[in-house]
Regions:
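Cofactor-pocket helix-loop regions in the catalytic cores of large enzyme subunits
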Residues: 1-180, 207-232
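Surface-exposed loop and adjacent secondary-structure segments within mature catalytic domains
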Residues: 181-202
């Protein structure tokens, strides 16, 4: 995540997509609720009407699996209407022309056909996101657990960079993980291919460092098995 929970509570505007936070991440959601109660506008894009959507300025019921088209539609409006942060993009981002060429293929009308969200709603959301700085974006497994999950994540990041919302307090991209403390477990090295801090077991320098720190003669130099490999 690029923001802390303390940032969540003080956000100026929040965009939640593919996340039933109130049930899956109630602690994180409590900070979002604090921000909303303090006046931060909230937009929730989710096929279902979740409890968090009831607190939103607007619930956007996109079709399952249409996230990229919907996000491309938003970015199309930002670019064609000149609402994106031109200075931020020019000074901090790469690949803008390639992104522009792609999202211009998704005017709101085409994005609406795919996502089920009206073209007018797409325009409204894009304009609202551009009206406040910074905006904080959050997503969960509703974005990642798809065959197009990587593209979903890239689209979320591209949207925030286009708006100039990455690298600032109260503005960023915040993925909430899928299982209880999976982030902390991974950070600490509870994975079959890395030590603490994602330092690979097949890296001799990393092994030597942890052998010395842990006071052991040798550590495994081959990655262990992932769950699919165990099942096989």
């Amino acid at each position: 995540m690029t923001n802390s929970f303390a940032d969540f509570a003080k956000a100026k505007m929040i965009f939640v997509i593919g996340s039933n936070m109130t049930e899956a991440h109630p602690v994180a959601a409590s900070f979002v609720k604090q921000a909303v109660l303090a006046g931060a506008p909230l937009f929730v894009a989710d096929p279902r009407r979740t409890a968090l959507a009831d607190m939103a300025e607007l619930h956007i019921p996109i079709r399952v699996g249409s996230d990229v088209a919907f996000l491309n539609g938003l970015m199309n409006v930002l670019i064609t209407e000149g609402l994106y942060d031109r200075e931020y993009v020019q000074s901090r981002c790469n690949g803008f022309e390639e992104l522009k060429a792609k999202v211009l293929e998704y005017p709101p009308e085409r994005a609406a056909e795919i996502s089920g969200v009206s073209a007018e709603t797409i325009r409204t959301v894009a304009r609202r996101l551009a009206s406040v700085k910074p905006v904080m974006l959050m997503y969960t497994l509703g974005i990642t657990e798809h065959t197009c999950g990587v593209n979903n994540v890239l689209s979320c990041a591209n949207l925030q960079m286009l708006l100039g919302n990455v690298g600032f307090e109260y503005g960023g991209v915040n993925p909430l993980r899928g299982q209880n403390n999976v982030q902390g477990a991974c950070d600490m090295g509870a994975l079959p291919n890395v030590f603490t801090g994602y330092q690979r077991v097949d890296n001799a320098e990393a092994r030597a460092k942890f052998e010395e720190a842990w006071g052991v003669a040798s550590l495994p130099d081959k990655p262990g098995l992932m769950i699919p490999q165990m099942l096989e």
